[in-house]
Amino acid sequence: ALPGSSRASWLTEPAVAEALRAQRKELFGVLEAEDAERHTDYARTLTVFLQHGGQLVQTAEALGIHRHTARSRIARIQELCGIDLSDPATFAEAFFAATAEV
């Protein structure tokens, strides 16, 4: 990002933005469906987890839940989505997808 810019300019390129929207729909669609069916809070949990750089304690504090609950939710999110958020590339992909404009 340029000085004074809050976002990397390449993220707004049409092809990149479209790819991120598609990834967001795929990733969060699964979680939103689970949330609707089971009254969970997985989509919000993942968003907060990504916003806090994968830090469970900070995520738990932001959500007002115990860190073990946050850990359990992240484990279930990874299972539902078939992803491993401990992998830096996967984490980055999820992070950028979460920031995509819908």
Question: Where are the model-predicted features located?
Answer:
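Cytosolic nucleotide-utilizing catalytic cores of signal-transduction proteins
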Residues: 1-102
